[in-house]
Regions:
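Hinge/lid segment of periplasmic solute-binding proteins
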Residues: 37, 111-167, 311-319, 384
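Glycine-centered hinge/linker elements that transmit conformational signals in sensory
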Residues: 199-204, 239-271, 315, 319-320
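Long, aromatic- and glycine/proline-rich binding clefts that accommodate carbohydrate-like moieties
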Residues: 313-318, 365-419, 423, 451-453
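Conserved N-terminal structural module of periplasmic/extracytoplasmic solute-binding proteins
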Residues: 2-123, 136-141, 324-325, 346-347, ...
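Extracytoplasmic/periplasmic solute-binding protein
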Residues: 153-169, 179, 195-243, 249-250, ...
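Short, solvent-exposed loop/beta-turn-alpha elements that line the ligand-binding surface or hinge
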Residues: 130-143, 187-191, 232-253, 302-310, ...
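Short helix-initiation/N-cap motifs at beta->coil->alpha
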Residues: 83-94, 192-197, 269-282
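Extracytoplasmic/periplasmic substrate-recognition and gating elements
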Residues: 47, 71-72, 77-79, 101, ...
Length: 453
């Protein structure tokens, strides 16, 4: 089966999204293993692989993957080289710099959903792995098609899936606050709650000096799902035009958020909440606009701190269904890559399988602190470990594709959104709505008009 994707709309056209079904591809041949794990017959001896990553660092997941790989291949050494930039985009910059200096690790990751995948391909930084997949006999249907589809560009495969979810598609709610106010919570898989109702609840739940009714991040994932919740979008599918002035629904979406943040002041200003999950665990916010990973994090925090249900109980309120039947979301995913020109690419490929296989993916979720709904077997294991994971399947079944800047200006794109969305929503130094929205639009459009990265 051929997987095709473009930088303009990296999920558009995949069979899963078009059909709205979360199904794995039918297997076409017997895989070399049943779980995407490594084949000890396919590696060279005395090999050292350098693994440059910022994912999972400090959790023990990376070390566990290295140790178990060493058990399979005693003559192969994997050197973990953590990336510790102040942001994810900083870490991509570090990898570009390392490549320019001839020091990029054999194992790296230029994620599609952070808009670096196609740039890394165009700059000849990461290599296609089709021949390695074919020689290995790997069955790519072990991964869900939507996330395997992200690994392809111009008909060639460049990686294996790492993380994947449906983006900032939910309000993570403290059910105890709702119950205390007599507000009936919707079912966690329902899309029946309007944005108008969310706004009313945010005002009702807000307590001046005690807690905020709603917390909203100023970042690209939130900007996109905000506009989609109102039936609009942030940029076009081609990745060339910012829509927030021309699309009346997108304009209405930002007006709604501006009213809550600047006029009603029920949303915290930037800096007043350092960690959204921690603030919600502590009861400082009643709702947080996030995603499935945030739901899981808050539930884990509540349990680890033995917080009573009458004080804090995690709940999920999904964004509303759109007129076309799609659910407001932004299907996003990551990748594991091999550096172009790696001397031992066959051995590196075995390590890719080891971290992206069933056991690696389960650990990536439960230990590594990521959300990776990228494999049916791993997702089923997560549901068995905690049924809350069933809440997240519905939006994977009928989610919306993400749109990427056509010029691969990922860092500039995300930075512009964060900077000017922050200014627009600043209740301490108020900018008139029309002026702030114009500035956000113009600076995002300026990035989209840049030459390719």
């Amino acid at each position: 089966m051929a997987y095709l994707t473009s930088r303009r709309n990296f999920l558009k056209g995949t069979m899963l999204v078009a059909a709205g079904m979360l199904t794995a591809c039918a297997p076409t041949a017997a895989p070399s293993t049943s779980t995407g794990e490594s084949d000890s017959s396919a590696t060279a001896e005395g090999v050292t692989l350098r693994w440059d990553t910022f994912r999972g660092i400090g959790t023990g997941w990376n070390e566990e993957r290295i140790d178990t790989f060493k058990e399979l291949y005693p003559d192969v050494t994997v050197e973990l080289r953590p990336l510790a930039g102040s942001s994810q985009q900083d870490n991509y910059a570090k990898m570009y710099a390392a490549h320019a200096a001839g020091d990029l690790g054999e194992i790296c990751a230029f994620d599609p959903s952070h808009f670096h995948f196609w740039r890394a391909i165009d700059k000849d930084i990461i290599m296609p792995i089709d021949d390695l997949v074919s020689a290995d006999g790997l069955d790519v249907s072990e991964w869900y098609e939507i996330f395997m589809g992200l690994q392809f560009h111009n008909g060639k495969q460049y990686g294996l899936p790492s993380w994947g979810w449906s983006g900032w598609d939910t309000f993570v709610a403290n059910a105890a606050h709702f119950k205390a106010e007599g507000i009936e919570l919707p079912e966690p898989t329902s899309h029946s709650t309007s944005m108008e109702t969310i706004g009313e609840w945010a005002r009702q739940l807000h307590r001046e000096g005690e807690r905020f009714g709603l917390n909203v991040g100023r970042a690209e994932p939130g900007a996109v799902t905000l506009t989609r919740a109102f039936g609009g979008d942030f940029i076009n599918a081609e990745g060339t035009k910012c829509l927030i002035l021309d699309d009346a629904n997108a304009t209405e979406a930002f007006r709604w958020l501006y009213t809550l943040a600047v006029e009603d002041k029920v949303i915290p200003s930037v800096g007043s909440v350092e960690n959204a999950d921690s603030a919600q665990t502590e009861g400082l916010t009643s709702m947080n606009w996030g995603g499935s990973l945030n739901v899981r994090n808050v539930k884990r925090n509540i349990e680890s701190q033995s917080i009573a249900p009458e004080v804090n109980e995690v709940w999920q309120i999904l964004l509303p269904e759109q007129a076309d039947g799609k659910y407001a979301s932004q299907l996003r995913g990551g990748t594991w890559n091999i550096r172009q020109g790696a001397a031992n690419a066959d051995t590196a490929f075995q390590f890719l399988k080891h971290i992206a296989g069933k056991d690696g993916t389960i650990g990536f979720n439960l230990v590594g602190g990521n959300f990776a709904a990228v494999r049916p077997d791993a997702l089923q294991a997560l549901v068995e470990q905690d049924p809350i994971h069933e809440w997240f399947i519905v939006n994977l079944e009928n989610g919306q594709p993400a749109h990427a800047p056509a010029n691969s200006r990922g860092r500039e794109f995300t930075d512009a959104i964060t900077q000017y969305m922050t200014l627009l929503l600043d209740a301490n130094q108020v900018t008139p709505f029309e002026e702030g929205l114009q500035a956000l639009h113009d600076n995002v459009q300026m990035v989209l008009d840049m030459d390719p990265a």
